[in-house]
Structures are given as C-alpha cells and as structure tokens.
Amino acid sequence: MQTIKIYENKGVYKVVIGEPFPPIEFPLEQKISSNKSLSELGLTIVQQGNKVIVEKSLDLKEHIIGLGEKAFELDRKRKRYVMYNVDAGAYKKYQDPLYVSIPLFISVKDGVATGYFFNSASKVIFDVGLEEYDKVIVTIPEDSVEFYVIEGPRIEDVLEKYTELTGKPFLPPMWAFGYMISRYSYYPQDKVVELVDIMQKEGFRVAGVFLDIHYMDSYKLFTWHPYRFPEPKKLIDELHKRNVKLITIVDHGIRVDQNYSPFLSGMGKFCEIESGELFVGKMWPGTTVYPDFFREDTREWWAGLISEWLSQGVDGIWLDMNEPTDFSRAIEIRDVLSSLPVQFRDDRLVTTFPDNVVHYLRGKRVKHEKVRNAYPLYEAMATFKGFRTSHRNEIFILSRAGYAGIQRYAFIWTGDNTPSWDDLKLQLQLVLGLSISGVPFVGCDIGGFQGRNFAEIDNSMDLLVKYYALALFFPFYRSHKATDGIDTEPVFLPDYYKEKVKEIVELRYKFLPYIYSLALEASEKGHPVIRPLFYEFQDDDDMYRIEDEYMVGKYLLYAPIVSKEESRLVTLPRGKWYNYWNGEIINGKSVVKSTHELPIYLREGSIIPLEGDELIVYGETSFKRYDNAEITSSSNEIKFSREIYVSKLTITSEKPVSKIIVDDSKEIQVEKTMQNTYVAKINQKIRGKINLEGSVLKQS
C-alpha cells in the first residue's frame, strides 16, 4: 500500500498517494498537514496493481455535475465517463469521450457543494452510479496520484477555489466576444475582403475573420499560400481598416522538409518514440513531426514562432487538431474504452498518437498515455507566451482540446458538430458543462460544422437561425462550416431570415458590455459567464433538470427555443423576474409561456450595462462594470464609484417613477415606455449618484 498524505489550505485538501509525477504542478500555497482522515473526507482508496481507485458514496438525491465536455445530461449520474482527448468529428449525443478532458466533478448533496479534482492527464475513468448504484468510482491508471477535495458550500465557492488552484482565466479583449465568421476555408484574399464588405454593407458587424488551413503553402505552418494569399500584409491592413480582426489556424504538425525553417530550427524539440528516434506521423502537410510541448525549450521555440507570425499584424491564433491527433494511426473507439465493462454503441474511428510516443516533462521521460490530455494545455501555454513575447496587450487564442488549467490561456469551442435539431440542444449542454468545470470562455460552431456527408444533416434556414439564437449569449460567437457545407453567413439568406439573424446579432452587441463585465468577473474570480440554472439556485432540485435555459451572469435568464416551435414554456426560478420585451413582472417558481422568439428575463436585483452607455436597473443590488466602475442601487438611489457617462437609464419598478435628480443638481423627467418600465434620457457624465423620485427601486 502506497503512503497517503493529506494537506489542507483554506478548505482545499490535497491528497497525495505515493510519489506522483503530475502532468502540471498546481502548488497548494501554505499547505499544512491536515488532521482530516480519508473517512472524514468521505473517501475510500483501493490500490489494484498499477491503478488507484477512489470511491465515495452516492446518495439518491445527490447531484453530480462538471467533468467538462460531455455529451450527456448536466447531472452526470448513471453513466461512466472517460478522460481521453480525441478528434471527435461528427459526434452525437451520448458519445464519449470528446475533445476536452477536465477531471473535475462537483457533488451537491443536501444543498452543499464539494469539488473533486484529479490531477492526472491519463485515461481516468469516472463511474457515477453505474457499476455501483450507490457509489462514485474514479479509476486512475497510475500507482501514484494527487487529487484535491474542494469545500464549498456553494458551487461558486468550489469554482473560485478550483481556479485559484489551476489558474484564473485570462481576460480577452472585448472584440473577442463579438460576431466572428469562419469557414473551411475562405480564399483567395480578395474574396475575404469582399465577403467582409458584403457583410458590413448589409449591416452586420463582423469582429473577426478566421482563416482555415487553405491559407498556408502546402499546409505548412507559418506560411502563406503564394497564389491564394500573395500579399498577406495587404489583407491584414484591409481588414484592420474595416475594424475587423484576423485569426489564423495553427495546427501542431510540422512538415518534414529540409528546406522548411520551422522543421530545421525545431530539431531536438519534437516528440520521440521509446527508441529515441523522432516520432514521424501524418497530418495535413504530409509527413509530419510534432512539437513536444511538455519540454520548456520547445515552448520557448514555439513562442518565438508565434511571436514572429503575430508581428505581421495577425490578431489571434486558432489551435486545432491538438488532442493531439495524428492521421497515421486510426483506432476504433472501443479500443479506447477496452477497459470498461459496459459500453454504449459507438463505432467511431479516432486518430491518436501511438503507444510508443514519449515526452520529456520537467526533465523526466514519460509515456504519452500518462500525459496525453495535457498536450493541448502546454501548446496553449506556449502560444500564450508567444503573444507575451510579441508584447501584445490583446490576446486571443481558441483551442479545440484542453485539460484543467486551459482557462488561463484560451477559449474552447465544441468542435466539429453536425447541424441537426438534436445537436442544437446538445450544444447548450456541452457549453454549460464546460462552463461549470472552470472553462468560462466557450462556444460552438454556429450552424453546425459538418457539410453534406451525413444523412441526419439539416440545412434548413429555420435551424440555422435557431443556432444563432441559441448562442446569443455564448462567450464565443462564431459561425463555421466545412468545405462542402452551405453558406452560413446570413447575407446569403433570403431577406426574412437574414433580418432575423441581424436582429439576433445586434441584440448580442447591445448586451456586449454586460457580457464583457462578466468576462472581467470570470478573470478575477473564476465564475462562469453562462451558467445552468442550478448554479444560481443549487438548493432547488427542480433546477437540475432544466437544460434548455441558461443564466447569463447572476442577473439574466435566457430560454432559447431549441425546437421547431416559435414559442415555448419557460421555467422561472424563485424570486421576481422582468420580461425584457413587454415589461411584465412575474413571480418566480413558475412556468410561463413565452411567445417571443428570444425569451429574456431579468432577475430582481440586477444592473445590466448596455451598448451606448445605457443602464438597466431593477431592484437593490451592486455590480462591477467591465471598466471597473462599481454601481450600487438602493431603495431610491443609484451610486457610482467614479465618474461615468450614462446616455439612458431604464428603471424597472412596480411603482411609478416620475423623475430623477443627477448629482443633486439636474432634474430629468422620466417616461414610462411600457409596463413597469421607466426611461430617463441623461446623456451626461455622472460624478456620484442619481436620486429617484415618485417611487422606490425595492419591490414590494
């Protein structure tokens, strides 16, 4: 039996079994030996050969959430999950694993949340009440391991401590939350500019354009195709003149070519096999080698390549295929799952590194299977350093794969989804699962990535519009499509559908200051931007079954329509809720019918900053805006921590508001625009406060 040590710091318990060599070191500051035993932590540990098995009891009314990107219900009970990054193209509901492995789950028992994070990048298996009805069983294929027990009592408390341990999310620039367009692939460069011009002429605000692999010369990284993109600097300048950013895809495969500079400069920094020879595989450029990102010197070299690439004016980097994938070895998913006694039907082929690949981590040689899931984390880390090396204040990295800590460096999107009504619902489950696993900056391919190669594909315009609507408040907002897929850019739709998408995109921009305020909150505290309802109402068991609505921060509930219908029933949690579209105030813990295509409800006690220096205030609360201005509302007063400009103030109140007084001097009349809604046009800087007359903000 290996030795077991337990350390503790501020409600985080580190359990060390044997002498583990973790894939990444997450130091527990001021760690002290804990007096708590495993039994007091509610755990049992069994060692079977080269495996460690950790068990905890599972109560009937207990909820298990987290585990990252899983194509299942958000309450993870009665299923077994595998942590093993794969290229999961055209995935479906109930297929596992996918691209991202976050070995963190949160138990909510009797209203109290506790987190369990296993710092292993190997094929960890979580059995949540499947093999044993009353147990959670975690199997780690190593004889030594470290894991953490994180006390709540709120889900939010667990995520704050988890991100304190694994790293707070980076703060992207505001443009990164705008509307992006992408395709596999846009070219030549004149057509890229022409498309942007068409979009802007039709009134679509495009924040960024993504270039897929066809911009490269023979798919070689850090090159431009000589005919498709003969003047890349001109392209970048033309886009920047239009206030549009350029993001280029960068895979992890370096072409074997004696005349190719990155191959020559990278010698000694690529992955090897056990014999010490280079691991030579296949990827888009053909015969390929792969950077060993676990090596510090490799990360330094890669950061230099990224920095040089960015020096042209490229604004962002899109990391793809980084599970990591290699085309020379395709295995059946059942081989990945071979150790599991129960398997769901899944006939996928996945492309992975061979078993004999090795890496060098902190000077030690380790097998690929022991650290596989952390490969994209180290790639993102090196890419992030490339931005720092180039002295960029604005950092944008998008990654398909990830491991615990990826939030420090990158956005995550849910990969190559398939346009269908089932997928529409699944995307919300996936992004919410990532959000409550410490990855706040998430999104999906709007419109579904796959082209016309699958029978279940639905290319209807109604579904495309619903994708745009579903993702209205997703932190990452990008349409993307395969080479043989329809055009998902809305300018190519008939006017009726084009205008629908335009309304959705404009509404997103209207709420962008609120979304970006939540991004600041995420970077400071580790809170998710979008959340399942149970995140805010964790002691209400009913909320754990609501998976087609989501909270945007604490204050906004959005209920996208994820069916062919044009209306839907909306579950409102306890409290009072303001219908954004008609001003109705509704008592919560109720189910209401919404006939609006974009059902939005504001929670009592909310402050919502909007585009154009507008504010919505509903009840008593406080809020930190993206520019660090603190706004506080009391019964008859709104205070500002510093001088800010306000163009329009919307006050939600069940009692009439007749006028406001700005900074004890200027009196402004208030107009009632719809029920419970009072609007004051201010158009000036406010030094300190606004007083309300004729009503109070506090609801009776």
UniProtKB/Swiss-Prot annotation:
GO terms for molecular function: alpha-1,4-glucosidase activity; carbohydrate binding. Keywords: Cytoplasm, Glycosidase, Hydrolase. It is found in: Cytoplasm. The keyword Aminoacyl-tRNA synthetase does not apply. InterPro entries: Gal_mutarotase_sf_dom (IPR011013), GH31_Enzymes (IPR053497), Glyco_hydro_31_AS (IPR030458), Glyco_hydro_31_C (IPR048395), Glyco_hydro_31_N_dom (IPR025887), Glyco_hydro_31_TIM (IPR000322), Glyco_hydro_b (IPR013780), Glycoside_hydrolase_SF (IPR017853). It catalyses: Hydrolysis of terminal, non-reducing (1->4)-linked alpha-D-glucose residues with release of alpha-D-glucose. GO terms for biological process: carbohydrate metabolic process. Belongs to the glycosyl hydrolase 31 family. Major soluble alpha-glucosidase. This is Alpha-glucosidase. It comes from Saccharolobus solfataricus (strain 98/2) (Sulfolobus solfataricus).
